[in-house]
């Protein structure tokens, strides 16, 4: 399932949660059994991934539940300077946060609705998915 989604939507605004491998330290996943994977469609990030040998570990430049920063200065302010490094590539091209899909269980779950809608995920997989967010909070394209 993860491969089907990755082939269809990457690079792009889709985060796929998969079961973490045993060798992945729990500090990377916050103690959770799943890990979110994403390949964004942003040239600077894609080049950084390439220069790092194919993968990097990171989080978004925001606190959970808050909007993502749109600039390096805003990220520093939001995170109270508690970061080791910021790569300032100019204003963020981001808009709506990525769609998050969890493929760790028997049924695929959409954890957050983003630019990719549930019907697009179902079409790519050829099976129904469970939408966890309340429908009233779903933003349409």
Model-derived regions, located:
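Active-site-adjacent structural elements in enzyme catalytic cores
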Residues: 1-141
